[in-house]
From Swiss-Prot:
It comes from the Bacteria. The gene is xkdN. To B.subtilis YqbN. It comes from Bacillus subtilis (strain 168). The lineage of its organism: Bacteria, Bacillati, Bacillota, Bacilli, Bacillales. Transmembrane segments: none annotated. It holds the Pfam family Phage_TAC_5. This is Phage-like element PBSX protein XkdN.
Length: 148
């Protein structure tokens, strides 16, 4: 490889400590949660690691024996995405003891469903969590950013 090409393919950008830390983002999820001044209280979300996503996938996967096909992997995708959203949500912390006790359930996913009980609130929250974890990134948008 020529010296010129080595500069183009500089691997130092990918070395530990060189990446930009994933940032917390504030996202309005529902108009129903307001502070004393009437301002919408945003949720705070932060992407989780690929390793944690892999763990969540394993935790939400079962295997079934299907005649003629053998052992088939079955991912509970609704639960998987809900768990990603739970793990990505910094505030409100649906895993907190206070919220779990207040909503009388040990399951943080159920807490989220009860808190976000109106129409599209729960779906909106799931979509935002999936989006910040890169599942909704449009490949064309990423290619355009890479060009700039």
């Amino acid at each position: 490889m020529s010296e010129k090409n080595e500069n183009v393919y500089d691997l130092s950008f990918f070395m530990p400590g060189k990446t930009i830390e994933a940032e917390e983002i504030k996202v309005p999820i529902s108009k129903r949660f307001v502070d004393k001044k009437g301002n919408v209280i945003p949720f705070i979300l932060k992407p989780i690691t690929t390793e944690r996503i892999d763990e969540l996938e394993k935790e939400n996967t079962t295997f079934k024996n299907v005649k003629g096909r053998g052992r088939v992997k079955d991912l509970d995708s609704q639960r998987f995405y809900a768990r990603i959203a739970i793990e990505s949500t910094i505030y409100p912390d649906f895993r907190s003891k206070d919220l779990r006790e207040a909503y009388k359930t040990a399951d943080p996913v159920e807490v989220a469903k009860r808190v976000l009980s109106v129409g599209g609130e729960y779906a909106n929250w799931l979509n935002k969590a999936i989006e910040i974890n890169g599942f909704e990134d449009d490949l064309e948008d990423l290619e355009e950013e890479a060009k700039n």
